[in-house]
Curated annotation (Swiss-Prot):
Protein's organism: Brucella suis biovar 1 (strain 1330)
InterPro entries per UniProt: FluC
Inhibition and activation profile: Na(+) is not transported, but it plays an essential structural role and its presence is essential for fluoride channel function.
Compartments (UniProt record): Cell inner membrane
Name this protein carries in UniProt: Fluoride-specific ion channel FluC 3
Amino acid sequence: MSVEASILVLVGGFIGGVMRFFLSGYVGRRIGETFPWGTFVVNVSGAFVIGTAAGLGARLGAIFSTTIFHEFIMVGLLGGYTTVSSFCLQSVNLMLDGEQRQALFNIVASALLCVLAVAAGYGGIMWIMEWPG
């Protein structure tokens, strides 16, 4: 990765992360915290935006297909905003490529394994921290 690409990802990721922080907090304060609505809104909106950007790139090319657009918007901004958007785009691309089984596996396995990984990490720390001495 070039220095220019790294800077684009860095700046985009910074902006995306700040956007996620503010939108998620705003939604949580407005709707309530009984469900993670802030994260939900960020994930769905990020998935919509990355799908829109990918569609524009596929139909219009030009600026939507440039390295700058890809690294700043797709990887940096949307990656900082929500990584679920990348996961969703990859799943849709598998479907569009006729790889429905791989898409389904990606969706189910990612969701299941990520939840299990969080539980394992959390449980592991709880267990280690309870260790005497």
